[in-house]
Amino acid sequence: MTTQPRKILVTCALPYANGAIHLGHMLEHIQADIWVRFQRMRGNKIHFVCADDAHGTPIMLNADKLGITPEELIAKAKADHIRDFAGFNISFDNYHSTHSEENKQLTAEIYNKLKANGFIKSKVISQLFDPEKNMFLPDRFVKGTCPKCKAEDQYGDNCEVCASTYSPMDLINPRSAVSGTTPIVKESEHFFFDLPAFEGMLKEWTRSGSLQSEIANKMQEWFESDLQQWDISRDAPYFGFEIPGAKDKFFYVWLDAPIGYMASFKNLCNREGIDFNEFWAEGSDAELYHFIGKDIVYFHSLFWPAMLEGSGYRKPTNVFAHGYVTVDGAKMSKSRGTFIQASTYLNHIDPECLRYYYAAKLNDRIEDLDFNLEDFVQRVNTDIVNKLVNLASRNAGFIAKRFEGKLADKLEDKSLFAEFTAQAEQIAAYYESREYNKTIREIMALTDKANKYIDEKAPWVIAKEEGKEAELQAVCSMGIELFRVLMSYLKPVLPKLAERAETFLQAELRWDNIHQPLLGHTLAPFKALFSRLEKKQIDAVVEETKALFAAANKAAEKTEAKPTALSAVEPIAETITIDDFAKLDMRVAKVLKCEAVPESNKLLRFELDLGDHTRQVFSGIKAAYNKPEELEGRFVIMVANLAPRKMKFGVSEGMILSAGTGGSDLFLLSADSGVTAGMQVK
């Protein structure tokens, strides 16, 4: 531990003010909160801020649909988000909104500096325009077929199947996600940030060790494909900040969103007298860390540091990215009851259970985390209830009844105590590097040793023997001491359990007093510290989630306005001739092997038998089949004469046919019994 406290500012990605907080959000906020709480225990000067991302077309459209103003919508969202984060014991020093005076001023200041320094350009561009809604369509409000891999139902800016990025103008068969109509092309003047001007700086920053290796490697790919000018403006109607000196032009949400980190901190500084420039000025010696999801790495590792550099502010010390949350091996699903909102979870389960489970599986890499519901129950009960809390309860009773709550005046096993406290720096190193899984593994190994000590000493046997009161007190006091050390290590993960432990121990759990035993100390009466997690609680969460989804669907069916036609039955495609159809060679194929592609959220990899040879095919149906191995041995229908397509994860040699609207609503087509691999579909 350094003698001078570190100065640290930590942020989480800003949740969008157009929806509820769910367990995917909570992964990041729990990860960051654990790190922040650890730094506080180490005596560092740390500030932890966040805000709602409160601008953009989706908010404008949703408010209109609900018959309220965007301001009313984001105010309710902010209140809900603050409630949910507090419910999970996320210890923000400030939670603000990008729709704030601080953010408006900082956004204008940064834009004007970039413009004055020659980094803002303007040009007339062609855009997709919804003639029915009389509005230009943002990238995410256009859907169509990917121009690269031909995957259908993809957004206007990137493909979730092949991970390509492109312009909405490049989409095949585009349609408005607002009205369902075919958009037209219109011209408009837009403002662009000159990102290529910062390529040299960004390459140097990438090599500085400021980024996770996965991010640094990804940035090299982006450099190789050439950086592009970044469109930072949007046309009215739009909910956001108007660009200074440009009528009916607004800042794109992704320009003012990261500035929201600064604005939230500025709001905290104004309230508590903190020096804003000490953390944000160019040359600042404070540390700045952003915790984000892997889906927004592009913005945080390219645009954001370039904006800061171009406007005279410091760059982040590091950007920590994490993966997505899956549930029972599949993408979170509303219909299956696994797209769990934070509020739904809190209605039934202690938030510390999720904090512990996430910590036990989190590491410093960009990997998806699977929230396995059965394993969740087992791990919480085994580790926290049966091992950790039981260590305290099995010793506290003897101390209370036989010794009036007073601990022994000396340690029964000094070497064991030294072994436990000697792990403090290793555990601290794991916390520092965000390798929480190693932290938990180390702590639980010590917990097992503590319980083994009690099992071997058997205080319940000693208690029955006359003249062994001192030995009984010493053994049980040792058990309580080991519990205190373990709870000190776990305090960043389980803050509320730590509070209850502090009440029982009548002592504060601090990192700097881990080595100081509570000799001759008096305990408070022991009360239950933690409750078992029951399967029925999980079932209640799943059922409530399903009910919320069903109610939302019912409400959507009743509304007259249909903001999207994407969920309706797709219209019949353009008529083709029999000759066109004859070009397709569809075959029955037997699934020899099926497995998930770990790096993709959508893809399964199939090895197919076509009778006289085998093929590899990638299919974007991962969300619909969370146990891909169960598809092995099944017969499917595939287009066999489709040209092989080179994808990020290998070559796909055909297309497997399925029906549905996408996501988890996809169903493989199959054939009646009696077919054999390679049969042609007539």
From Swiss-Prot:
What Pfam families does this protein's entry cite?
Anticodon_3, tRNA-synt_1g, tRNA_bind
Top-rank lineage group of the source organism: Bacteria
Transcription regulation found in the keyword field: no
**Which Cys pairs does UniProt list as disulfide-bonded?**
none
GO terms (molecular function) for this protein are: ATP binding; metal ion binding; methionine-tRNA ligase activity; tRNA binding
Q: Outline what the protein does.
A: Is required not only for elongation of protein synthesis but also for the initiation of all mRNA translation through initiator tRNA(fMet) aminoacylation.
Q: What is this protein called?
A: Methionine--tRNA ligase
Sequence motif 'KMSKS' region, residues: 331-335
Q: Where is the tRNA-binding domain?
A: 580-682
Could you give the subunit structure recorded for this chain? Homodimer.
- Binding of Zn(2+) occurs at C146, C149, C159, C162
- What's an example GO cellular component term for this entry? cytosol
Chain span(s) of sequence motif 'HIGH' region: 15-25
Q: Name one GO biological process term.
A: methionyl-tRNA aminoacylation
State its Enzyme Commission number(s). Answer: 6.1.1.10
Q: Which residues form a coiled coil?
A: none
Note the InterPro entries from the entry. aa-tRNA-synth_I_CS (IPR001412), Anticodon_Met (IPR041872), Met-tRNA-synth_bsu_C (IPR004495), Met-tRNA_ligase_1 (IPR023458), Met-tRNA_synth (IPR014758), Methionyl/Leucyl_tRNA_Synth (IPR015413), MetRS_core (IPR033911), MetRS_Zn (IPR029038)
Q: Which family does it belong to?
A: Belongs to the class-I aminoacyl-tRNA synthetase family. MetG type 1 subfamily.
What detail does the entry give on cofactor binding? Answer: Binds 1 zinc ion per subunit.
Q: Which UniProt keywords apply?
A: Aminoacyl-tRNA synthetase, ATP-binding, Cytoplasm, Ligase, Metal-binding, Nucleotide-binding, Protein biosynthesis, RNA-binding, tRNA-binding, Zinc
**Which reaction does this enzyme catalyse, per its entry?**
tRNA(Met) + L-methionine + ATP = L-methionyl-tRNA(Met) + AMP + diphosphate
Keyword Nucleotide-binding among UniProt keywords: yes
PANTHER family of this UniProt entry?
A: METHIONINE--TRNA LIGASE, METHIONINE--TRNA LIGASE, CYTOPLASMIC
Annotated residues for binding of ATP = K334
Where in or outside the cell is it found?
Cytoplasm
